[in-house]
């Protein structure tokens, strides 16, 4: 196996048994590909902005004299880059410019001829751009647009499963769902009549829509029924026999022919009877008159002589009418063939309740339902019906809808028009009747073949189209009203509606969410999330159990484990590792093709619709070294069921064992040994882990860690290979390999690192280089670690030495006992950064002012502020400290003559301003790490703002100058090479200034040209550098675009260092969570025979009932991994030969069945072995992929190799007494996480504070600085104890007795500890409520 530069530093021992056939795909492609499709110019106009423009344009005026046509569009460049937008609170977007053509036609001419054409580029608002990591910056905050799982357009057949009607009768229905437009529902009622609903309005008989489609009664009956033909000869009635139709009926007369009786009267007609009739070629039988009476005729019969109607279609035959027909010489009568079994008379019955008799009356009936109360006209009714389903402007089935529609109706062709036609509606009704007749089955709406993914690009396109449609109306008005000769396209278009639609979507849509940025995993999971909620989706309240449940088609597409607990369970899912969406938006998953027992490496992606037809084997099926199945019977999936199949029947095989789970769940080692509920908690809690100050890779991982760290975008990855030329904390510079440079470029890559930046969740984003100077690196190597990554691997927590044992009740109910050593070593210390803003506004009474001159504030409070009134960087502040001094003007008060005089003498201004400074919130303390000042254009900048500006300018100039110098050096080194090849001495060149190098005359013309080219390049570089500096200077010095009325914004960033403490929540990766109960001195912790104390003590009772055994296996394997690390460490300390070290490490890698990974250290140099050993001395990292991990015997082998007991249990001694504990204890290394539920954020206390206006009781919650609720159950408790005075205190002075609490406060200040309870305000509220009911109630004094 070939290792990259960073992988060589620390190799994970992999226990995977099955080779990795398919690499893990780029994990953010669902977001990036979708948005790329949206903004990329699509010549066919099927996707993105192009499709939206083409669907709305051209726009014609109402009078048809003019037309506005769309030509093309282009996206400009963003004004600010991503980081600048985040700092300034701006949106990262690009201007959209559209080329439009206004065509004016000649009036009063029969053939329209073009009079004038005007073409112009028009600005159409801003389009937010996606960053490289799949997010959007909206108003300075990073947001993610979550993909939506919605019902696919098409036709769906369903039933109510007998729940609607009291009789329990199953009622079938069909629904045509377009991508946009009106829904069309067909449904049976309990009487078996068929109805239609448009847009869920009042139901109408289905025949109304058929009449509206211009069918008469005869045509309707012809469409849906087979005919029985009765011939009348010599007063005998002969039935033209279709023998299959008789099956299942009871003969009401003897069925005979030529004297032979085939079926006796009263007998049921069976298949055997029908066979006999066929055998004897019986085509007709004589039937009694009673047999034909009551049957329904299929067409109108008119008297040929008089033209009088004898009988109308869909009427029952009676003896009288039969005689009339005979008399009018009708000797052949057509009736409808119906029976109770499989040819129901539904349409015939529905025609009877239909009040309409022709097309116009049907259209009017539809109009009355859709537009009740509006006046009826023939044109209006026709227009409405035409626009409902047959107009491209109002109805769009989309290519997906048409494909699903045609597939559902078993048509051969799956493409077609995107509107409905007559045949579509009739075919749907026919299929629904077939289902009612027992032929065919209803659809499963939770099948992933009926639900599709709508990603960012598609949702943005829909929003954009909505904006365009709003513009279209205005344009039509202007084209009809305005003076066309002077109008230009620019005057037609108002970009506001488009911008508003886009802004509304990205800013306030339910699916555009504030990014979860706790750690790299939470970012990646948020971008891969799939929600069934949102516009056009489900709502929490209406979603039933079936929609939320795991469906067989989720296999390999949607994770069955990762979903939130609570009301959203099952509605918000996560994409599986290998899943992707196809061109129609359906999820598909990869499989390996199988040919005659041979499993090939050919990969096919199948959607849920296609998958049902194949037999698919599991990924862990046994195959030999030639990739043939070993067993004859193999466990497979087919049509959603799992069972054993002969290996010759197998079509496909799963690609990987981790195919079914999401990224989050695939990071849980030994997932196969955990209960699903706990695995769900484990996957969810990993997303809440706070990045620690010192990162530590997991000793026991799953091999997914590197993929998550790299794809999340928090690490810095090399774009091209080369040598590290320069490195410091904030930038890495690489001299690119010659073969990877383009012609005419300097061959230098510069990577700037992010330092101590605040994330959305107030955690700290900081990147640290993990490479050294002059090291050779390859493309895609990790250069710098971000938050929660260690040498390019995800590192969410710390490896802790844990013991499973009770310890003096400190681990009761999942509590965790932690050693003081963990705090001392800063193992779980985290940095949190808070942003506090102070806004200076222009008020009615005058502008607010930011200054250090604040009324009634002592010198001490202002000691941390500079003369501009803004806190210094580096100041340590605590709750209540002033960060930014601000004064607000208050209303003028009447002054006495004395005050006026004093003010005139001393210029005293303090009385007409009030203090509105920004202070540190209660309970928060930290260090000021940065200050940003934004000043409105035209407002004078203060001294501090100018200082910050100068600093930024200096830094930008220094960075760009250094960059330029490096590029320049690179260029001159190339020139030096060329000149030295002409026997010009290097020493001579070094003494010569660079400018004179170009003047050296060379005979070789080609080389001379080359040098001239390099000179041009140098000049070009210089120009670019100057331009860059100018752009940067302009950006830094220009005024900021602030909200109306805002003069200045000061943002102060506070960094808080938080150590772990009692009350913090911790968890493992298996759903084993708990709260720290005590930080115990290290000397009191249990220790082993070597005197090594444990770090954490966990409760063993937390394991059996929770059934998450994965944590125990992880602990054992972690112990073995640490043991190997200790051995390597001892060898390093003893300075053993590198060959011995190499042998030992090779031996460790060869333990167990390493079928996936064969590590060969022969290719490694001595330095590389030493580097590897140094990184392995803290423990050998292990990868145990989900469902393909280490077996029990392999863990024992590892423990044995580390000279540890194979039981994984060791004897421990009590740290306080030194006594040995009664029995051996499970001790090992578990990966523990500190979750973002910190006691500092939750702990809160109040003495006095704000009160509710109505009840006068203290507010609730930390945010409102509220009190503790003393509810009715607490009142009962005090009543039960008889603590009457305590209770009185609680209900009066400590709550809503306004006078009492004021008096009590005064008494305490005076040192008088007495209280006088009065009337609680809530009693007055009760009186008022009773009075509001019209009952007078008064308090009487006795």
From Swiss-Prot:
Reactions accelerated catalytically: RNA(n) + a ribonucleoside 5'-triphosphate = RNA(n+1) + diphosphate
Listed CDD domains: RNA_pol_B_RPB2 (cd00653)
GO CC entries: DNA-directed RNA polymerase complex
BP-aspect Gene Ontology terms: DNA-templated transcription
EC annotation from Swiss-Prot or TrEMBL: 2.7.7.6
GO terms, molecular function: DNA binding; DNA-directed RNA polymerase activity; ribonucleoside binding
The UniProt record lists the keyword Nucleotidyltransferase: yes
Keywords linked to the UniProt accession: DNA-directed RNA polymerase, Nucleotidyltransferase, Transcription, Transferase
Cited Gene3D superfamilies: 2.40.50.100, 2.40.50.150, 3.90.1100.10, DNA-directed RNA polymerase, beta subunit, external 1 domain, DNA-directed RNA polymerase, subunit 2, domain 6, RNA polymerase alpha subunit dimerisation domain, RNA polymerase Rpb2, domain 2
Keyword Nucleotidyltransferase: yes
Pfam family, one: RNA_pol_Rpb2_1
Reported function: DNA-dependent RNA polymerase catalyzes the transcription of DNA into RNA using the four ribonucleoside triphosphates as substrates.
Binding partners and assembly: The RNAP catalytic core consists of 2 alpha, 1 beta, 1 beta' and 1 omega subunit. When a sigma factor is associated with the core the holoenzyme is formed, which can initiate transcription.
Record family assignment: Belongs to the RNA polymerase beta chain family.
Name of the protein in question: DNA-directed RNA polymerase subunit beta
Organism encoding this protein: Buchnera aphidicola subsp. Schizaphis graminum (strain Sg)
